Each structure stands twice: as structure tokens, then as C-alpha cells.
């Protein structure tokens, strides 16, 4: 129970003259003091000003503010004229959902409104699980999270447990994961080098196999956390690095050179389609109606950030890892845009083609039938 105690009365002049108090008191009874009227006014104000949108409740009483993701219910009211006003709200615990995403500025931007309680959440609370994409991919194979970001490559291994959400995509539209090195290498040379990769379930790794025309077992690679790939190349652990995230904008600062942009290559080979890198998925344990409600909430969060870009970018800066505001804003714009609000026909086709080619070349075990929340 959440108990709200009435404060001190404003004085006799605060009496409403019965307009508010009348419905709550015997109309034949006179107001004995301002406190009784204050109670009635408080209740009327609460009932008028409570904003309840399926779990979003804001109740204001004077200078005090109550924000609870609860359904409002008045269990009992003290009608004693000289007692403090007592208003009880029965608390209906909102459903808590785990939401996995990477600690990167684009994901932080996307979920700004959820992190700061800026939009209605339709009876849900979101527990943000911040982990690198390879870890999230692995957790998704075990069905551990309610909603999570995954690599599109990983979707091929979790489609029995998760459905794709229509929003939340990260598309490389004329850009994407990059191969960098201390000196320029061409494809035939790279195929013979040791490559530092950010994870075997990342879309970058699948794109690399498609670009090389070889399955992973036929070339040399080492898995390195994505934020340590520069160091791996510079220290000689690997000769080539497959970089994702903001490394695509900062590799020159590390005195490395670009060998290939896999997003550019993919677009040339596939009629200008974007390279599908990541998406959000929802656990199939939820019924269709619940999936849709959650999906709409996540889409609303993305739309809010796009509509309030400056403040959302400021929030995202805390995850920017050595990027200034301008660079972080550029990175966010690369991966949170119209593709993120909805894949659209081209976005869906790019996933079909990406996973279809992977299956035809024996890089994933099953042909995929995409299942989207609608």
C-alpha cells in the first residue's frame, strides 16, 4: 500500500465552499475547519490530475508529487474533519521485463525515453541489461531475456525462441563493419591473415564469410572484445581487425587504414540494399497481444528520441567511449533513423537475402522464415 498523508491546511480561506466537499460529506453537515475541506479538495485534485495510461500514473498534490506505475484505487478515506487526509492507493505491481542492449550510444539513444520514464509503458517496467552484443547473442540462444538486441546473424539461431520486432533495426546503409590494418591489404591477402573479430555470432562475422567466400573453418581468426580490436591489431595479436560500432568512425585516430567496408560491398552486390546488422527481438513466451503492446512501447521510445534528438544525444554521450558530442551524434544518426522505426519492405528483404545467401553457402544451419511482430 502507498499511503499519502495530507499536509497542513492553508487556512480558513482554503475552504471550497462545498463544491468539492459536498459529494464526500453529508450535505447537511457544516464544514468545521479548513482541514476537512483541504481533504476533499485534495481528493478532487488527485482524481482530476491523475494521469493513468495503462500503468503510467502521476498524481500531484500541492507541492508533493507521486509517480507510481500502479493502477489507482482508493481503498479507504478518512472523513474525520480534524484528521490528516489519508488516501490509499492499492499497488498493482507492473510486469518487469528484461531488456538487453549494448552499452553504446545508439542503443542508449534508442531507449532514452524508457530509461528516464518519459513515455507511457502500458503496465510494464523495463530492467535494462547492458552487455556486449556477442554476450546478448549467446544469452538469446538460451532464451534468457524477454526482449533483447541481437545480431541478425544470431537470429538464425534464436528464431525458435524469439520473434523480430518491427522497430529497433541497425542497418548499414552504404556503410558497415570494416576491415582495418596497419597497411592496405586486398581480399586475397586478408584471406591468409589472422583476423580479430568481435564475435562469431555477429552480423559482421557472417558478412566477412560472405565477402571472403569461405566458411569460418577455412580462415584464421581470433575472437576479441569489440573495443579491444584496435589494440589487438596494433600489438600484433592479429594482422587485420573487423571493427563495429563507433570504431568505424575512429579507426584513423589509431593510425590504421581501411581495407574494406563490408556495408559498401554488400550494397554494390545487392542492388543498394542496406546491410542488416542488428535488430530487437521478443521472447515468444508472450502472447500475440502482449508482444504487440511491448512492440508499440519500444517504437514509441525510438520515436521520442528522434523527436527530442538533442536531449537524447546528451543521454547517449555517457556511453560514447572517447567520442565527443558531434561524433556521437553522427554515429547515432548512422544507426538510429527511418530504418530503426520500421524495417520497411527493403529492410525485410535485406534480411531475407542476407540469411538466404548464408544458408545457400552453408554458413547457417536452417533456411529462415522471418517472423515479425505485427
Predicted stretch roles:
Residues 164-187, 266-285:
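Hydrophobic/proline-rich hinge and linker segments of small-molecule sensing/allosteric domains
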Residues 15-16, 21, 37, 54:
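Cysteine-centered motifs
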Residues 106-110, 119-151:
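Extracytoplasmic small-molecule ligand-binding "clamshell" domains
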Residues 23, 42-45, 71, 76, ...:
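Short, positively charged and aromatic/hydrophobic N-terminal segments
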Amino acid at each position: 500500500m502507498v499511503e499519502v498523508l495530507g499536509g497542513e491546511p492553508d487556512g480558513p480561506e482554503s475552504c471550497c465552499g462545498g463544491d468539492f466537499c459536498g459529494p464526500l460529506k453529508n450535505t447537511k453537515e457544516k464544514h468545521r475547519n479548513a482541514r476537512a475541506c483541504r481533504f476533499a479538495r485534495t481528493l478532487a485534485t488527485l482524481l482530476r490530475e491523475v494521469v493513468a495510461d495503462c500503468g503510467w500514473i502521476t498524481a500531484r498534490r500541492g507541492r508533493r508529487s507521486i509517480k507510481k506505475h500502479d493502477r489507482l484505487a482508493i481503498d479507504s478515506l478518512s472523513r474525520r474533519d480534524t484528521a490528516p487526509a489519508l488516501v490509499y492507493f492499492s499497488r498493482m505491481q507492473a510486469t518487469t521485463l528484461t531488456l538487453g542492449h549494448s552499452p553504446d550510444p545508439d542503443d542508449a539513444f534508442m531507449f532514452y525515453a524508457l530509461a528516464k520514464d518519459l513515455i507511457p509503458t502500458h503496465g510494464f517496467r523495463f530492467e535494462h541489461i547492458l552487455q556486449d552484443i556477442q554476450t546478448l547473442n549467446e544469452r538469446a540462444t538460451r532464451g534468457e531475456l524477454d526482449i533483447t538486441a541481437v545480431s541478425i546473424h544470431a537470429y538464425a539461431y534464436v528464431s525458435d525462441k524469439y520473434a523480430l520486432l518491427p522497430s529497433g533495426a541497425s542497418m548499414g546503409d552504404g556503410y558497415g563493419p570494416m576491415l582495418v590494418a596497419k597497411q592496405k591489404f586486398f581480399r586475397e591477402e586478408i584471406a591468409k591473415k589472422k583476423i580479430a573479430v568481435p564475435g562469431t555470432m555477429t552480423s559482421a562475422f557472417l558478412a566477412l564469410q560472405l565477402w571472403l567466400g569461405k566458411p569460418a573453418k577455412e580462415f584464421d581468426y581470433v575472437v576479441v572484445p569489440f573495443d579491444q580490436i584496435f589494440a589487438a591489431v596494433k600489438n600484433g595479436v592479429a594482422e587485420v581487425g573487423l571493427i563495429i560500432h563507433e570504431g568505424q568512425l575512429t579507426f584513423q585516430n589509431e593510425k590504421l587504414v581501411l581495407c574494406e567496408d563490408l556495408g559498401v560491398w554488400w550494397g554494390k552486390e545487392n542492388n543498394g540494399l542496406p546491410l542488416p546488422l542488428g535488430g530487437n527481438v521478443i521472447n515468444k513466451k508472450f502472447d500475440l497481444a502482449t508482444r504487440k503492446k511491448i512492440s508499440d512501447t519500444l517504437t514509441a521510445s525510438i520515436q521520442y528520441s528522434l523527436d527530442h534528438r538533442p536531449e537524447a544525444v546528451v543521454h547517449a554521450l555517457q556511453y560514447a567511449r572517447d567520442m565527443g558530442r558531434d561524433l556521437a551524434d553522427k554515429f547515432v544518426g548512422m544507426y538510429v533513423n527511418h530504418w530503426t522505426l520500421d524495417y520497411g519492405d527493403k529492410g525485410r528483404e535485406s534480411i531475407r537475402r542476407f540469411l538466404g545467401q548464408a544458408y545457400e553457402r552453408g554458413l547457417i544451419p536452417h533456411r529462415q522464415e522471418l517472423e515479425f511482430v505485427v
